[in-house]
């Protein structure tokens, strides 16, 4: 676990009312810097299938653009490659594997965890899946077949 001052900066010093974007950028920066300090050229992230679909939907509805993070991203300014080896694994399968293996789960310390736009999107997709079986698979397929960068 990498200790940072991101929380106090985002919530106290900056007093962000919508902190997620700034926090995410700062966390990525801290992770990239730590990887470089350790001499790493690749970072494996834990984004899974559901994260990708949620991001795709959030980008479409909230930003008016078609986009999502890609399975592999090269960051030329940092000379780092980001890989997402769990991208085709649904969240429930990842959670099940973690429980079966007995891996520890680090709980988020974020004061807005559980009440974010991502959480709303996750719940909305869950409801849409009940009403329109297979919608999540179709959205994921649209990312793969569409013109989403690096898919």
Report residues per predicted region.
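A structural preference for short, hydrophobic beta-strand core positions in alpha/beta folds
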Residues: 1-3, 107
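Active-site adenylate/phosphate-handling loop in enzymes that bind or generate adenylated species
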Residues: 8, 15, 19-93
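ATP/NTP-dependent adenylation/nucleotidyl-transfer catalytic domains that generate, transfer
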Residues: 12, 67-151
């Amino acid at each position: 676990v990498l200790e940072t001052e991101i929380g106090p900066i985002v919530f106290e010093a900056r007093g962000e009312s919508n902190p997620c974007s700034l926090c995410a950028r700062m966390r990525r920066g801290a992770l990239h810097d730590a990887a470089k300090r350790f001499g790493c050229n690749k970072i494996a992230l834990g984004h899974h299938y559901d994260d990708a679909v949620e991001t795709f939907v959030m980008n479409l509805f909230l930003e008016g653009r078609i986009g999502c993070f890609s399975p592999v991203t090269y960051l030329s300014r940092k000379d780092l490659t980001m890989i997402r080896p769990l991208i085709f694994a649904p969240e429930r399968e990842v959670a099940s594997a973690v429980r079966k293996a007995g891996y520890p789960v680090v709980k988020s310390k974020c004061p807005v965890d559980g009440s974010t736009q991502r959480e709303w999107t996750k719940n909305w997709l869950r409801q849409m899946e009940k009403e329109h079986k297979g919608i999540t698979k179709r959205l994921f397929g649209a990312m793969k077949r569409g013109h989403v960068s690096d898919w």
